[in-house]
C-alpha cells in the first residue's frame, strides 16, 4: 500500500486512516420523483415539497428574503399545477425555469443524473487531509457550489452533458470527478 504525506497512523501500529467521502443525492432522488410525477400528470402533495424544502442541505439556497423554504414549496407547487409564478423573485424565477427545463425531456434529465449516480470517489480518499467529507447534490438556483466545513454542496443544474455521448459530464468545463477533487482539496 502506498502512503502519502497526508496519511495518518493510528495507535502507532501502521494502520492507515484515509478520508471517507460520502455522496448524498437524496434530494436529487426526490426531485426525480417530482419531475417524473409532473411529467405523468400526477398530483403531488405540498407536504412532499416541504419535506424537500426543510432538508438541512437545502439551507444553502436560503437567504431569508429572495429565496426561502416557502419559495421551494411555491415554485414546486406551481410546477406541479402547471402554473406560472405570481410575482417571483429573481431566485424563485431561476429555480422555476431550471426545474421546468428538467421537464422538457426526461431522457436529458436522466443523462444528467446518471453520472451522479455512478460517481465513485474512493480513489480520492487517500489524497484528502480531513477524516470525512460530504458531497451533496441539490437543485440550486444561482450558485454553482457551496462549501461549509467538510461539506461540498453542488448545484445539480450546473452539470453539463455531451448530447452525443462522446465526452464526460462536466461542471465548469471540467469532468465532474476532477471538479469535485479540486473543490475538496481546496477545503
Regions found by a protein language model. Give the residues of each.
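N-terminal low-structure segments adjacent to metalloprotease catalytic domains
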Residues: 2-111
Amino acid at each position: 500500500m502506498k502512503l502519502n504525506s497526508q496519511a495518518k497512523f493510528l495507535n502507532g501500529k501502521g494502520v492507515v486512516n484515509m478520508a471517507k467521502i460520502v455522496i448524498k443525492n437524496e434530494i436529487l432522488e426526490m426531485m426525480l420523483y417530482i419531475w417524473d410525477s409532473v411529467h405523468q400528470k400526477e398530483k403531488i402533495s405540498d407536504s412532499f415539497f416541504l419535506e424537500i424544502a426543510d432538508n438541512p442541505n437545502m439551507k444553502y439556497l436560503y437567504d431569508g428574503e429572495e429565496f426561502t423554504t416557502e419559495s421551494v414549496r411555491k415554485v414546486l407547487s406551481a410546477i406541479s399545477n402547471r402554473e406560472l409564478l405570481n410575482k417571483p423573485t429573481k431566485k424563485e424565477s431561476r429555480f422555476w425555469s431550471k426545474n421546468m427545463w428538467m421537464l422538457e425531456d426526461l431522457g436529458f434529465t436522466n443523462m444528467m443524473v446518471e453520472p451522479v449516480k455512478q460517481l465513485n470517489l474512493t480513489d480520492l480518499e487517500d489524497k484528502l487531509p480531513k477524516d470525512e467529507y460530504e458531497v451533496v447534490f441539490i437543485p440550486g438556483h444561482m450558485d454553482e457550489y457551496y462549501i461549509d466545513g467538510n461539506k461540498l454542496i453542488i448545484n445539480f443544474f450546473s452539470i453539463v452533458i455531451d448530447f452525443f455521448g462522446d465526452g464526460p459530464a462536466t461542471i465548469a468545463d471540467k469532468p465532474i470527478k476532477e471538479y469535485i477533487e479540486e473543490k475538496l482539496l481546496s477545503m
